[in-house]
Amino acid sequence: MDLKTFIRNQFIENEFNRVDMLVRYHSIKEYLLDENYNFGIYKEMQEKRKFRNKYISRNILESLANKQEPPGSFEELSVSNFKTLISSFKEKGFDSAHPIRCNENGNLLDGSHRLALSYFYKLDEIPVFNISTTRQPKYSIKWFEENGFSDKDMLIINNEIDILKNYINFNDEKI
């Protein structure tokens, strides 16, 4: 599917509903500029999402099954897995064996990290897999406001939204 079209599908009533993808995008940019980047805003987002999110690292599951302490915090494991994905994507590109999952309306369900990397590398096309559901996660700017992100983080996020809108030629028309 065309990347810009897929991104446009993430606007619901003129509001970008997958700001979590932009936090990942911002983190990719910062990390590739400086390998010592601390992933602060990303870690905060992951911490605040973890109880809503069904995702639990395989490492954590294995540790729990073996009645051992997990090999690091959820946030540390999220960053480690993210760095591995960034490296793999940089080296090999998008692995089409792992398409981005979306609902029947084209709303992102699973694959926000891969979508952020696709946006970073400005791919023309991305592989998607449609799932027969209308369910959609909601991570609009309101979610970040309601979860107490700092003014500095909100400035970063709003700037990334503006850059994204420019990239897809979004002009606040009714979507």
Kindly label every feature range from the protein language model.
Residues C102, I131-S132:
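Residue-level "edge-of-site" marker
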Residues M1-F74, K174-I175:
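Glycine-rich short-loop/terminal segments
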Residues I126-N130:
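Short hydrophobic alpha-helical runs that function as membrane-insertion/retention elements
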Residues N105-Y121:
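A sequence-level detector for short glycine-anchored, His/Arg-bearing signature motifs
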